[in-house]
């Protein structure tokens, strides 16, 4: 654009006026020039505006009742767990916002500490799905990790920092966004130490992993290898602060109910003690009476339990709940398969007793809600194989006999159209 200097051949930035000799790069456009410094400044302004736009105002943060209501649309039952999670998540993100806005000068400075969550309950009862649904609602990065793959640093297996890499990847390598995400660590009961007493031999996949997780659970500046795997001194690291990352750790904790019952039963010993029969102890929610001492006896170390102050337990799903899971949620399995059949121009129908039979099979197999899809696949496999090759099927009806006795679903033929009838008569 404008030229300066005696020779008239020295270009300058159209925005800041610096000459091409004063900057590293000068980029030409149709009638204008812009320098690298102005480009950097523009990028900084855009990033600041995007960051401001991403900040959720406190009055926009969903209230616990709204979080629970959202979960109701996807997860059947587990009311106590929903309430516990809703309050814990609300308080967690309220704490983050309080830190970003700074302390109110009218109040005494109070540091709000993080409350990670421990979820207990049998397999197939909705622990993972609850956490996934929460992350979807809040629109935050979410990562799932398997505790059984982790080992103490220096041994074969994954370092605990690889959990953080999954979160960073879920945030498209936006570290700032990842720092307010949710990490779900499953199968945490499998890293319990082998006995209640500390071992003199090194337990690299049990107690060693618990020790390694302590810092990132509490909040630390972690160095994460960008490609995963083991650390080595000649690679660059991604730095991430885990102070505002919410950790939800979960496990089935098979055998913990016996430890709880053993402790609760001891209350009946001695004069004047309250005697409780087995029938009086809540067996529908095995973990309703869990205490830190039970978890320590199970094999979790006290320091690990101390970093998981919120405990949410899920219960075994009964037949009624499994039937509701099949048909009521927004993405229920029955609705999914009806949609699949619609894409082939066929109507799919399940009778009420067919849904009950599917629920009975899931209970018999002990797989909970996770096993419902496998049963549906087994029941519908023959017709899903045949129907795409046929054009004479209008409707498929799945009955109780289809599920229990391996009878083929009832096929309702399609009535021929007028043109087809005309062609046949001709």
From Swiss-Prot:
ATP binds at residues 122-129. Belongs to the ClpX chaperone family. The keyword Plastid does not apply. ATP-dependent specificity component of the Clp protease. It directs the protease to specific substrates. Can perform chaperone functions in the absence of ClpP. Component of the ClpX-ClpP complex. Forms a hexameric ring that, in the presence of ATP, binds to fourteen ClpP subunits assembled into a disk-like structure with a central cavity, resembling the structure of eukaryotic proteasomes. It holds the Pfam family AAA_2. The keyword GTP-binding does not apply. GO terms for biological process: cell division; proteolysis involved in protein catabolic process. InterPro entries: AAA+_ATPase, ATP-dep_Clp_protease_ClpX, ATPase_AAA_core, Clp_ATPase_C, Clp_protease_ATP-bd_su_ClpX, ClpX_bact, P-loop_NTPase, Znf_CppX_C4. GO terms for cellular component: HslUV protease complex. SMART domains: AAA, ClpB_D2-small, zf-C4_ClpX. Keywords: ATP-binding, Chaperone, Metal-binding, Nucleotide-binding, Zinc. Residues 1-54 form the ClpX-type ZB domain. Coiled coil: none annotated. GO terms for molecular function: ATP binding; ATP hydrolysis activity; ATP-dependent protein folding chaperone; protein dimerization activity; unfolded protein binding; zinc ion binding. This is ATP-dependent Clp protease ATP-binding subunit ClpX. It comes from the Bacteria. Zn(2+) binds at residues 13, 16, 35, 38. Gene3D superfamilies: 1.10.8.60, ClpX chaperone, C4-type zinc finger domain, P-loop containing nucleotide triphosphate hydrolases.
């Amino acid at each position: 654009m404008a030229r300066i200097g005696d020779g008239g051949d020295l270009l300058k930035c159209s925005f800041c006026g610096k000459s091409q000799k004063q900057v590293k790069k000068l980029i030409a456009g149709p009638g204008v020039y812009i320098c690298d410094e102005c480009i950097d400044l523009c990028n900084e302004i855009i990033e600041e505006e995007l960051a401001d736009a991403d900040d959720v105002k406190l009055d926009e943060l969903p209230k616990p009742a709204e979080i629970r209501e959202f979960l109701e649309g996807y997860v059947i039952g587990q009311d106590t767990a929903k309430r516990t999670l809703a309050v814990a998540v609300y308080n967690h993100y309220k704490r983050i916002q309080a830190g970003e806005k700074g302390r109110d000068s009218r109040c005494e400075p109070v540091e709000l500490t993080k409350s990670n969550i421990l979820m207990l309950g049998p397999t197939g009862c909705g622990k993972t799905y609850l956490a996934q649904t929460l992350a979807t609602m809040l629109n935050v990065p979410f990562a799932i990790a398997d505790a059984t793959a982790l080992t103490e640093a220096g041994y074969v297996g994954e370092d605990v920092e690889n959990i953080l890499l999954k979160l960073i990847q879920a945030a498209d390598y936006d570290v700032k966004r990842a720092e307010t995400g949710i990490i779900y660590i499953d199968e945490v009961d499998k890293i319990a130490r082998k006995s209640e007493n500390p071992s003199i031999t090194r337990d690299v996949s049990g107690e060693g992993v618990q020790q390694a997780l302590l810092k990132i659970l509490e909040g630390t500046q972690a160095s994460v290898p960008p490609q995963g795997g083991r650390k080595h001194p000649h690679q660059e690291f991604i730095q991430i602060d885990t102070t505002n990352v919410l950790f939800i750790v979960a496990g089935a904790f098979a055998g913990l109910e016996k430890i709880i019952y053993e402790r609760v039963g001891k209350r009946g010993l001695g004069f004047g003690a309250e005697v409780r029969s087995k029938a009086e102890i809540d067996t529908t929610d095995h973990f309703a009476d869990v205490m830190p001492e039970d978890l320590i006896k199970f094999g979790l170390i006290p320091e690990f339990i101390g970093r998981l102050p919120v405990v949410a337990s899920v219960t075994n799903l009964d037949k009624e709940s499994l039937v509701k899971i099949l048909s009521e949620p927004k993405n229920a399995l029955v609705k999914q398969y009806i949609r699949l059949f619609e894409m082939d121009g066929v109507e799919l129908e399940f009778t009420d007793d067919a849904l009950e039979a599917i629920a009975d099979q899931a209970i018999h197999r002990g797989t909970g809600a996770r096993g419902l899809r496998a049963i549906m696949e087994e029941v519908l496999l023959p017709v899903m194989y045949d129907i795409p090759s046929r054009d004479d099927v209008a409707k498929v009806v799945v009955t109780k006999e289809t599920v229990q006795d391996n009878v083929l679903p009832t096929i309702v033929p399609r009535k021929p159209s007028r043109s087809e009838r005309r062609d046949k008569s001709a």
